[in-house]
């Protein structure tokens, strides 16, 4: 009997002692970088969802090593951030201690699964030797004007005691904890991601990423072309700009809308409307951007009492405020054309505002018309279609100095301040004379000071503000200053960790340029689709900044991205609160790591969400036990006697072996592991039925299965008499000629009725086939006493004998 407990421990110990998976550096070999999205080391440890993506990259890494590549396959920890801090607050423990314990537990669990990580390259984002370089990147951004301070409307979560980025809000609540979010103005550090909007958009085209992820990034960046138009406020010297993608509809404007928080609102509101305007502003101040811009919500708004003048026809139109207009998006003001825009139509219908048609088409009694058509009621645009009218209107606006062609983005700059303790300190000092300076590079890392009270202060300061010895500084001239007390978001360290794996112990620079040139971009990156517009966008942004600084040699970090699906339990996402988490340790204990790895790869396509079956690992264990019994004599743990595994080849397994090597290699490359495993099962069935198995095929099959079930295959490999690990044994190849059957079955008919069949060499000539057919005993029975008049032979198919 195969004992997974002893065999798995034995090989895990062997790999660790022999540094089996140390990253290769042979200059003659090609390089391959297989990366997992590193985990946040929570106290809960791994559940069976984690190993799915990890097993996939591990299989590819193991195959690539055997194919003669230098393989970089590292692992590390995304250790800063809210979850650890929340846990530490609840239990009173030190977040650093909690993090170290969680990492040790995670690492133990990962090693039990037999992953081929190079642990010499392990990184932890909360390690000062690591975040020294996170701070260094921030400093370079500051010097380039890409990191700046601003008073901005933010998403404030009192329950978390911090600001959260737009990307961290789901359905109007914080992604972490599901707490309500309120809008307020605060001084924040911002990263100028908008400066890279066009490149972030354009360079997506060159990436081998799932189309839905690319589409999510495109929508998040939200590039739109149109015009910026200046409206004057009636009876005043004030003006405001609107951005519109439909400048061709300017003649149809019947009102304008300002963001309620716009400074202009207070300046233009009439005394009669002031009370209503102030009440409305108070009512909406706690709403998040997402709530405010929800297309399905009821439209609300208030008239300011003021009017704007339409620059194209001099008509006066009322100025309203409404929460669907955001101060942070576009210009914070919109022109409304209810006849040709759904949102404007709903608003105008509710508040009884005019609906002026300027394009032919549709039924305005029922709904707005957004399609193409001939322009009407539009003076110099009459008779033109949409695109021609847009161009013509932009020319007119530019000629009259009341507008210009403009590109707008939905993407905002990245809110980079968090009012929490457990994060990278921002290396900035605010001086009493009002100036700001960076902590000198040679003094980095600016270490996070130890603190016992890490409760959020509930103010725009983080708990670091209480550590006065750390906060207060004096320069050599006696000038007093205070350190920045906000910390970086937990997305900071994960925006560049894949670079540090390439050169993890370098204390002179982030990573050596020549090494980066060898390994970048990442060849395969596997992780969850939930990171589409956060981590994956942030990392691309940082990478482009570093490219411009000459730190990295490529424009993009990750060439191929793949999202694994979720593993569900009872059709629901696994979570502690639902009590449906399956712990991999228990599965490994009962069935072995190889069975778990194989089951997770065999469940279905890697990118599908699939329900966990408690009997699944038992069925893959059954298959692996069959493999064991085919090759190993359980009594003495020696290879099966010579009569089954032989040095000669009778050709019986040629075709199925060639098919198996071909399909498994191609399917591993394409990440189609379930179909690769099915093909290995086909080979197993054939091998069990065969009288003998050529040694070359037995060993080749074990090598193909090794990336999926490495422990058992290492053991069988050593039983076959090999002293070295299977990890670097040359990957099997196949003879394409053997994909075609070397023999064919020939049907024999006598007077049109099937009377026999025989096997013959493929493409045998007619004479040979005729002789063979006539010699069959069963056929001769039907020819007794008859004369053979004619023999019709169709090579490779049939011999038809006509006899009378």
From Swiss-Prot:
Keyword ATP-binding (UniProt): yes
Chain span(s) of sequence motif 'KMSKS' region: 573-577
Catalysed reactions, as listed in the record: tRNA(Leu) + L-leucine + ATP = L-leucyl-tRNA(Leu) + AMP + diphosphate
Location(s) in or outside the cell: Cytoplasm
EC number(s) given by UniProt: 6.1.1.4
Enzyme class: ligase
GO molecular function: aminoacyl-tRNA deacylase activity; ATP binding; leucine-tRNA ligase activity
Entry GO CC: cytosol
Sorted UniProt keywords: Aminoacyl-tRNA synthetase, ATP-binding, Cytoplasm, Ligase, Nucleotide-binding, Protein biosynthesis
UniProt xrefs under SUPFAM superfamilies: Anticodon-binding domain of a subclass of class I aminoacyl-tRNA synthetases, Nucleotidylyl transferase, ValRS/IleRS/LeuRS editing domain
GO biological process: leucyl-tRNA aminoacylation
Entries under HAMAP family matching the protein: Leu_tRNA_synth_B
Entry protein name: Leucine--tRNA ligase
The organism of origin for this protein: Lactobacillus johnsonii (strain CNCM I-12250 / La1 / NCC 533)
